[in-house]
């Protein structure tokens, strides 16, 4: 279906919503979800070294923040969104996943300054992830928790989760946070929103075009 503004809403969808089909329309509470099928690996490290990961994904969709689950065996996944905190100060994040996963947060709203803040990997002794049906197990491994990250209220940051699923069911990815002075809780969905590819990275490989 036609999608000239690359916001993952077809022209038919935009007509129903009454939005401009030629201007990117942010969808609050959603990630952009890129999927690569037939990726026969078990770790994100292997996925990131695969040529397939830097090519076209099998599919790109929008997915609600609380619905990242039940994806197919032997598949790689990248979830991206802009995140806008409501308070300035130190934030902490937790990552829960059935399989190998990484949480990256950028210092701005582009992928060029992203940093790895939490992860699950067999290479860290975490097996293939939390390995449970529950999506809210935050303290199984120390590597699930980030350090304190200084963020500014109202500023957009790119958040990216990369996950590799081997085989088996009950796949899931979820995030929690502790805002300044607050307790840990699931990250509110309305702080996330879909995002376009940066103008300087239209091939979507997280490298500025000027570097290539």
Mark where each language-model region is.
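Acidic/polar, compositionally biased interaction segments
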Residues: 24-204
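Extracellular calcium-associated, cysteine-rich motifs in secreted modular proteins
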Residues: 1-29, 195-212
């Amino acid at each position: 279906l036609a999608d000239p503004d690359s916001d993952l809403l077809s022209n038919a969808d935009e007509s129903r919503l009454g939005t401009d089909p030629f201007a990117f329309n942010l969808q609050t509470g959603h990630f952009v979800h890129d999927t690569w099928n037939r990726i026969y690996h078990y770790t994100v490290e292997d996925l990131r070294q695969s040529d397939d990961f830097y090519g076209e994904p099998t599919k790109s969709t929008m997915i609600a923040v609380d619905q990242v689950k039940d994806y197919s065996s032997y598949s790689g996944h990248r979830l991206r969104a802009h995140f806008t905190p409501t308070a300035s100060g130190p934030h902490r994040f937790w990552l829960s996943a059935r399989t190998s996963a990484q949480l990256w947060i950028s210092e701005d709203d582009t992928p060029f300054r992203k940093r790895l803040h939490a992860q699950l990997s067999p290479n860290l002794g975490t097996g293939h992830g939390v390995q449970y049906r529950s999506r809210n197990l935050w303290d199984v491994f120390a590597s699930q928790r980030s350090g304190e990250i200084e963020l500014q209220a109202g500023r957009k940051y790119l958040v990216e989760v990369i996950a590799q699923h081997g085989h088996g069911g009950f796949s899931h990815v979820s995030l929690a946070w502790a805002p300044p002075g607050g307790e840990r809780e699931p990250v509110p969905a309305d702080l996330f929103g879909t995002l376009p590819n940066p103008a300087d990275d239209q091939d979507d490989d997280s490298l500025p075009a000027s570097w290539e």
